[in-house]
Amino acid sequence: MESGFKVTLKDAIRTIPDYPKPGVQFRDVTTLMGNAQAFRRAVDELVYPYAGNRIDKVAGIEARGFILGGAIAHQLSAGFVPIRKKGKLPRDTARIAYSLEYGVDEMEMHRDAIEKGERVVLVDDLIATGGTAEAAAKLLLQMGAEIVAACFIIDLPDLGGRKKLEALGLPVRTLVAFEGD
């Protein structure tokens, strides 16, 4: 990468203690995204393994996955597919329900966003328990996508999300791990 790079990706991520509740260390990736050098490096590192390969679409999970996914799609000359919370898309959608800590939520995508057999990279800023990413991956698979990889800037490995995606047979790429979260 750039020889003058001074800040590590991990250093570019702000930690906010006790947010949103006591005992939680919130990893705020928006500080990395606001640092041009760090953001470029993160995007470049996530793109690198797939550059030169056929990637048809990048699917980003609402909301920070849109920011990251758009940049990655641009670099890969691929289309971008938003995966959104229920009720946010205007046309015919495919939907999947998934469990949260205290209930159930749903996410959706346009039915015509993916053609069967298209090669897709799934993107979000962070993987923790993996529930949202797992649901997004299952939705893409239901739509006929071939998921090339799931990519995240941050991994909270103690919460097991990576293992959920790997259990689906998906390669997972992360750039920074915060152990003990």
Curated annotation (Swiss-Prot):
One of its GO terms (molecular function) is adenine phosphoribosyltransferase activity. Coiled coil: none annotated. It catalyses: AMP + diphosphate = 5-phospho-alpha-D-ribose 1-diphosphate + adenine. It is an enzyme of class 2 (transferase). Catalyzes a salvage reaction resulting in the formation of AMP, that is energically less costly than de novo synthesis. One of its GO terms (biological process) is adenine salvage. InterPro entries: Ade_phspho_trans, PRibTrfase_dom, PRTase-like, UPRTase/APRTase. It comes from Brucella suis (strain ATCC 23445 / NCTC 10510). One of its GO terms (cellular component) is cytoplasm. It is found in: Cytoplasm. Belongs to the purine/pyrimidine phosphoribosyltransferase family. This is Adenine phosphoribosyltransferase. Pathway: Purine metabolism; AMP biosynthesis via salvage pathway; AMP from adenine: step 1/1. Homodimer. Keywords: Cytoplasm, Glycosyltransferase, Purine salvage, Transferase. Its main location: cytoplasm. Its EC number is 2.4.2.7.
